Amino acid sequence: TAANADSKPYATIAGIKAVQSHLDRLGLNAKVEQARRPFTYKVTYAVPDSHPLVSIIIPTKDHADILNNCITSIVEKSTYDNYELVIIENNSTEKVTFDYYDKLQAKYPDIVRLVTWEHEFNFSKLMNFGVAHAKGDYLLLLNNDTEVITPNWIETMLGICAREDVGAVGAKLYYPDNTIQHAGLCVTGGVAGHLCQSMPRNNWGYFALNDAQQDFSAVTAACIM
């Protein structure tokens, strides 16, 4: 027995080696590290050697300040550099919004493309319209009211998404008050519901599930690759 986890660092090292060996045997290019909670492990999958283009597709209507926060956080914080921003304009009416579009395209002509959806709001049709204008190898759907807080978010999602056995990858999202907005969806009885919603951001949850990569029934389209 031990008073705390730090008393047996060799156990943590052994755990890392065990998980790393498993991934190596599977032929997966990934690195294993200790996660925040003792005896839990973080796996970072390598980005494909082709350094693929990621199309970030963002639907928006007015509220230029909100969109600006989103775009600025992507451009200033993201460490992955091969991406494009497909902005879907959906029936905005405010002049400040269209002025912002002009400034945005002038400032980032190589990565920003504005497309206009002239029909009534329908999320599925709206996003499919944006996808039709995307040039990337991978698609990342993103709400305009989100803000990047983790610099390596694109490559982290991309590394997982590039695996042949993965269909889609979501992200852990927080409300402004640092509580959990999204940490995966569970479908029970034909109804989808958020897991651990409104729990404190740093709450690990049952068996540290709030802090671990795992399979879910679904993930929110607010941020999905």
Question: Which sequence ranges carry the predicted segments?
Answer:
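Nucleotide-sugar-dependent glycosyltransferase catalytic core
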Residues: T1-K17, I180-G190
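A short, glycine-/small-residue-rich helix N-cap motif at loop->alpha-helix starts
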Residues: E118-L126, V131-A134, V148-I149
